[in-house]
A protein has these predicted regions:
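Fold-level signature of zinc-dependent metallopeptidase catalytic domains
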Residues: 4-14
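Metzincin-family zinc-dependent endopeptidase catalytic domain
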Residues: 15-123, 130, 134
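Short strand-loop junctions, especially beta-strand C-caps/beta-turns
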Residues: 10-12, 105-107, 146-148
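Post-HEXXH active-site segment of zinc metalloproteases
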Residues: 134-148
Length: 148
């Protein structure tokens, strides 16, 4: 990983019970310094039914990351996300601006540890894109494209 990268971990609307654990795991695995912030009010986003357009969250994430002095941003949101070409997405990353967003609405389980592991895996996947990692054909790799 490039050195001196700092990540803003932005929770939209709520902080999950395992936010500290997520921060710790990401920091250890990716060797990043991480700051946590909460944005209680969602920014406006285009809608398709109950879903929200994933890319609409990246500009506000960029603004907040820059104001916090962070080079990378990762948003966590409960709302279901989409991009025009797909029915839904678990997350979206923009390597150009080093921002990503992950939705956990499709990861929810009655077992909190299962939910956490799913969220952590998707966060690492999207952050991998920020470091220009491509999709992988190996289904055991975190960069595997899940819709295959």
């Amino acid at each position: 990983m490039p050195e001196n990268n700092e990540l803003l971990l932005l929770f939209f609307q709520e902080v999950l019970p395992f936010a500290s654990k997520l921060k710790k795991e990401l920091a250890e695995y990716l060797k990043l310094k991480i700051r946590i912030k909460v944005m209680l009010k969602l920014p406006p986003a285009k809608r398709r039914g109950q879903q929200k357009l994933a890319s609409d969250f990246l500009p506000i994430l960029l603004t907040l990351s820059q104001s916090a002095g962070c080079q990378l941003g990762l948003g966590i949101i409960a709302d279901d996300l989409y991009v025009p070409a797909l029915n839904f997405v678990f997350g979206l990353a923009s390597p150009r601006i080093k921002m990503a967003i992950v939705s956990y609405c499709r990861f929810l389980s009655t077992n909190e540890e299962v939910t956490f592991k799913r969220l952590l895996t998707e966060c690492v996947h999207e952050l991998g894109h920020l470091f220009n990692l491509p999709y992988c054909q190996n289904s055991h790799c975190v960069m595997f494209f899940l819709i295959h």
